[in-house]
Amino acid sequence: MIEFEKRLVAREALKLIGDVKLLGLGSGSTVAIFVEELAKSDKAGKIKVIPSSKQIEEVARNQGLEVIYPDGERPEITVDGADEIDSNLNLLKGGGGALLREKVLAYNSSTYVIIADHTKLVEKLCSKRALPVEVLPYGVSWTLGNLIKRFNCDARIRIKDLSPFITDNGNVIVDINCPPLEDPASMESEVKGVPGVVEVGIFVGLADLVLIARGSEVKVLRQGF
């Protein structure tokens, strides 16, 4: 059912593209499905895409889409996924480790659209998942210790294949196991205030539209409504 919902919401997002010429692409499994649907549509030969990760760049190239890199013109729309979405449309992101580039795309897009299945809806961010933080490799053990001390939470360097997970930017991901967030904006600011932190996977006020699939229906949520 979840796979069905992902494809359903991806197809719904495709309807929003219109005559857009430059499209930003987030990362993750739902965005990968969106790329597949985009490649099958009549828009495929008329659009250029800016990927947020090597993962989604590979998917886009394999699907025959024209890939470009950020330089000058900004995306009219970026389509992205999320790990959690709260009632104010704040987002938790970074499960795939692409949070920094995703946030750059989100900030520089005219419209930022989130697509997700219904399991991503939560009352408060960090209800189900740890908070991803991208940090510099330089002094990473110090940064980890400072995060643990500052927030009195368990925090660990993300491991992949027995080694620290390295982002596309050459950084490390630290996952903070914190309680559900009462004030995401404050938490974002506090985490970014720790030297060594590059970016944090809290996206406050960036999502313009959130498309949520539940069963055979897609609900559209808008910022401010």
Curated annotation (Swiss-Prot):
Enzyme Commission number: 5.3.1.6
Q: Where does substrate bind?
A: 27-30, 80-83, 93-96, 120
Which InterPro entries does this one have?
NagB/RpiA_transferase-like (IPR037171), Ribose5P_isomerase_typA_subgr (IPR020672), Ribose5P_isomerase_type_A (IPR004788)
Q: In which pathway does it act?
A: Carbohydrate degradation; pentose phosphate pathway; D-ribose 5-phosphate from D-ribulose 5-phosphate (non-oxidative stage): step 1/1
Which residues are responsible for catalysis? 102
Keywords from the UniProt entry: Isomerase
Entry-linked Pfam families: Rib_5-P_isom_A
Which biological process terms from the Gene Ontology are attached to this UniProt entry? pentose-phosphate shunt, non-oxidative branch
- Give the enzyme class: isomerase
Superkingdom as given in the UniProt entry: Archaea
* Enzymatic reactions: aldehydo-D-ribose 5-phosphate = D-ribulose 5-phosphate
Q: Which GO terms describe its molecular function?
A: ribose-5-phosphate isomerase activity
Annotated HAMAP family:
Rib_5P_isom_A
Matching entries from NCBIfam families are given as:
PRK00702.1, rpiA
> What's this protein's family per the entry?
Belongs to the ribose 5-phosphate isomerase family.
UniProt function note: Catalyzes the reversible conversion of ribose-5-phosphate to ribulose 5-phosphate.
* Complexes and interactors: Homodimer.
Name-wise, this protein is Ribose-5-phosphate isomerase A
| Organism (species) | Korarchaeum cryptofilum (strain OPF8)
* Designated gene of the protein: rpiA
